[in-house]
A protein has these predicted regions:
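C-terminal catalytic lobe of FAD-dependent flavoproteins
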Residues: 159, 287, 328-407
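N-terminal Rossmann-like FAD-binding beta1-loop-alpha1 element of flavoenzymes
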Residues: 1-24
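Rossmann-like flavin
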Residues: 81-202
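Active-site substrate-recognition segment that forms the wall
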Residues: 18, 40-41, 46-90, 218-226, ...
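Glycine-rich FAD pyrophosphate-binding loop
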Residues: 17-37
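A conserved short coil-to-beta-strand element within the FAD-binding core of flavoproteins
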Residues: 162-171, 189, 210-227
């Protein structure tokens, strides 16, 4: 296996449970990338893509406004343009409805899937059942999102829309901050994503799994099979090979014969360490498109979309925006210090992850491209990949996620 984020670790544990001997190879070790720095939400209702109608007309204004959560490293634009044209093609109602149908299958039982994955590993303690809130500054802002909430309702998501006096019962920490709060039921969170995945990986090793920290250089092929992964620490042979490399999947996917428009969508977080008060539940602040999550000993604010590739250094502007938003939302909270982080979301042009077998090779499977819902969908994706390898029939329509049939 290549890649030790949530998808890779989940796949490895489920394969181990099915009786396979597994090697997990990652250049930095478990949970060293996006799986560490995400917002920690198990968001079964995250079935609306970024590419919604109106995105094309709104984007230029957002890029020119440093208070909006969209950023671009302009030197990267020539390389980005081919992907961007394909990506923006999907900013239409038909695709949003198709995306919601596909992702509802993958995400609806995310909390149960994580609990099943963590059972008996010692990682159970990191999983919490929580409501997930969406906060709107104005009723007009909420009404602009009405289509998304109607679509969630259509897919049987349970939520309450609160206004007026009802807002006082949600969380005192947000009193006066919002005119509308939507309370999503049947959600959850991981209170420390990095430690959660490391604990899962520790269980994997304790049960005779092997984790190898190495850079993957290529692979060895014989006929229609990959028989070994070439790394800077030697060649590792295998009967089956699975790639779950997240944002580092783009170049590799081409070598696997896949035609996937693919980019890294850069995201940021800051953390308020040892805050004097804690929110009860995580909340998406709609105006700034960032998520506030109470975690072990800190409040994490995660969000922002920046296109700039995998190699560029972190930008100051997204971090400063998150700090500004934190100061506005939590003006009365004291904390010891602030930490900062940059990560990469693996993004396909149609925003759907790729899950399944690769036609070019008889023994290769992939699982990547979850964009904003990698943690939410990662446990189930790993289970699906393990079931496919073991020739079981997953209880999901996988045609939406076919890596060979990208349209």
């Amino acid at each position: 296996m290549a890649g030790a984020g949530i998808v890779g670790v989940s796949t490895a544990i489920w394969l181990q449970r099915f009786g396979y001997q597994v090697k997990l190879i990652d250049r930095s070790g478990p949970a060293s990338g996006t799986s560490y720095g995400n917002a920690g939400i198990l968001a079964s209702g995250s079935i609306i893509p970024v590419t919604t109608p109106g995105l094309i007309s709104k984007s230029p204004g957002m890029l020119m406004n440093p208070n909006k959560p969209l950023f671009l490293k302009y030197a990267y634009l020539p390389r980005l343009m081919p992907f961007l044209f394909k990506y923006l093609r999907y900013a239409n109602i038909e695709h949003v409805e198709n995306y919601a149908t596909a992702m509802s299958q993958l995400l609806y039982d995310t909390v149960d899937q994580h609990k099943a994955l963590a059972r008996g590993t010692g990682a159970e303690r990191y999983i919490e059942n929580n409501d997930y809130l969406f906060g709107y500054d104005t009723e007009e802002a909420f009404e602009k999102d009405r289509f998304a909430w109607d679509l969630r309702r259509k897919h049987q998501h349970d939520f309450d829309i609160l206004k007026g006096d009802a807002l006082h019962n949600v969380d005192p920490i947000y009193d006066g901050s919002f005119k509308v709060i939507v309370v999503n039921r049947n959600h959850g969170k991981i209170n420390d994503p990095g430690e959660y995945i490391k604990k899962l990986a520790e269980h994997f090793v304790d049960n005779k799994g092997e984790i190898i920290q190495a850079n993957i250089k290529g692979f060895q092929q014989k006929d229609a099979a990959i028989i070994g992964l070439e790394t800077d620490r030697g060649v590792h042979r295998a009967d089956h090979v699975i790639f779950t490399l997240g944002p580092w999947s783009g170049d590799l996917s081409k070598r696997l014969g896949l035609n996937i428009p693919f980019e890294s969508e850069r995201g940021y977080h800051i953390e308020l360490i040892n805050p004097s008060r804690m929110p009860r539940n995580p909340i998406m602040v709609s105006s700034g498109k960032f998520v506030v999550t109470p975690m072990d000993g800190r409040i994490r604010l995660a969000g922002v979309v920046e296109f700039g590739g995998l190699k560029a250094k972190a930008s100051k502007a997204p971090i400063e925006l998150l700090k500004k938003n934190a100061k506005k939302l939590f003006a009365d909270i004291k904390y010891d210090n602030i930490t900062e982080w940059l990560g990469h979301r693996p993004t396909t042009a149609n925003s759907l992850p790729l899950i399944g077998r690769v036609n070019k090779f008889k023994n290769v499977l992939v699982g990547f491209g979850h964009q904003h819902v990698g943690l939410t969908g990662g446990a189930k994706t790993g289970r699906i990949i393990a079931e496919l390898l073991d020739e079981r029939e997953p209880n999901i329509q996988l045609s939406w996620f076919d890596p060979n049939g990208y349209v």
